Amino acid sequence: NNKGDLISARNINKRQSVGNPEDSPFISYQSCLSNKKNYFFINAKDKIKELSNQRIEFKGTNWLTNSNLFVISMNEKGDFLYKQILSDEENDVPFMVSKGVVIDNSIVFLGRKGKKKQLLKVTL
């Protein structure tokens, strides 16, 4: 809140690893705040594990072969929803979520695979 008190705290469980440090923008996450909601964008496999106490775990991804883009939205009380924005079958390139840029009420991600590049704009 505006007094600096912690109202809620949540973990986002995501297993990830990277062999090449240049690939790290593809496997991390981006967080932004809009309309009193916190949004987290992540690349992960499509297999999501439901844990106890309303928790979920996203498995890591090999961004070359499996890069699904998810968004998690969390309200002021810590309640969250998640959904897949793009599957690896729908996008031609993996998106660098850790390098997202917030512009007004949107976030823009750059996708890249070899020489192929693509921009993705998501309205919050």
Locations of the language-model features?
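Short, conserved, GDST-rich strand-edge loop motifs in beta-rich repeat architectures
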Residues: 1, 43-65
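Hydrophobic beta-strand positions in blades of beta-propellers and related beta-sheet-rich domains
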Residues: 2, 68-71, 117-121
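Conserved blade-ending motifs and adjacent loop-strand segments that build the rim/top face
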Residues: 5-30, 65-70, 74-104
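Flexible loop/turn segments at secondary-structure boundaries
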Residues: 6, 16-18, 47-50, 116-117
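Extended hydrophobic-aromatic, low-complexity segments
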Residues: 6-10, 39-42, 49-53, 81-83
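Entry beta-strands of beta-propeller and related beta-repeat scaffolds
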Residues: 36-41, 104-109
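Beta-strand C-termini and the immediately following turn/loop, strongest in propeller blades
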Residues: 44-46, 110-114
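Extended, compositionally biased alpha-helical segments that mediate assembly or anchoring
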Residues: 110-111, 121-124
